């Protein structure tokens, strides 16, 4: 009876089998999983590129800060290859001649700047330290006709700075 009614109405549709429905769902789930995986990888690589760009930016700013400070240096002191103190005209926080220090401790490179070059050149106040960059390795050497020095006071012709296995040589004055 039902068959005759459906034939009269012109209905020739019999429906989907379970296998067809399962195959369709599997194809749709594969497409969505591919889209999700590609989005996840793109996000991961973008985050990695952003982190690398920030690291390179901080290294470039540090390089520029060191170059400016050493180009205007009037007096320089290096302690154990980990601290660099200067009397320089290349201040970044204050104008004019300043007392400046680059101190590496706890995996961070700190900047200390004081507007008046008075007192001991290697004195700094802990609460006035400014974080410059996170560096695993920071070493400073004075280079003169006698070689490289970890401890130095005066004005050498060159200063060598090692940042995370990269070596930079700066001409002083």
UniProtKB/Swiss-Prot annotation:
Q: Which Pfam families match?
A: N_methyl
Q: What is this protein called?
A: Uncharacterized protein aq_2118
* Chief place of localization: membrane
State the UniProt keywords alphabetically: Membrane, Methylation, Transmembrane, Transmembrane helix
Q: Cellular component GO terms, alphabetically?
A: membrane
What parts of the sequence cross the membrane? 16-37
How does this protein lie in the membrane? Single-pass membrane protein
UniProt subcellular location: Membrane
Q: This protein's superkingdom?
A: Bacteria
Maturation-removed propeptide residues: 1-15
**According to the UniProt entry, which residues carry N-methylphenylalanine?**
16
């Amino acid at each position: 009876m039902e068959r005759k009614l459906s034939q009269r109405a012109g209905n020739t549709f019999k429906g989907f089998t379970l296998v067809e429905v399962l195959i369709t769902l599997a194809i749709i789930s594969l497409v969505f999983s591919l889209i999700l995986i590609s989005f996840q990888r793109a996000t991961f690589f973008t985050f990695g590129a952003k982190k690398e760009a920030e690291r390179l930016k901080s290294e470039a700013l540090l390089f520029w800060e060191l170059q400016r400070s050493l180009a205007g240096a009037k007096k320089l002191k290096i302690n154990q290859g980990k601290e660099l103190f200067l009397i320089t005209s290349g201040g970044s926080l204050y104008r004019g001649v300043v007392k400046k220090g680059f101190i590496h401790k706890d995996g961070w490179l700190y900047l200390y700047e004081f507007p008046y070059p008075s007192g001991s050149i290697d004195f700094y106040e802990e609460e006035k330290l400014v974080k410059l960059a996170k560096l695993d390795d920071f070493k400073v050497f004075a280079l003169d006709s006698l070689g490289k020095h970890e401890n130095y006071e005066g004005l050498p012709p060159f200063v060598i700075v090692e940042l995370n296995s990269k070596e930079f040589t700066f001409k002083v004055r």
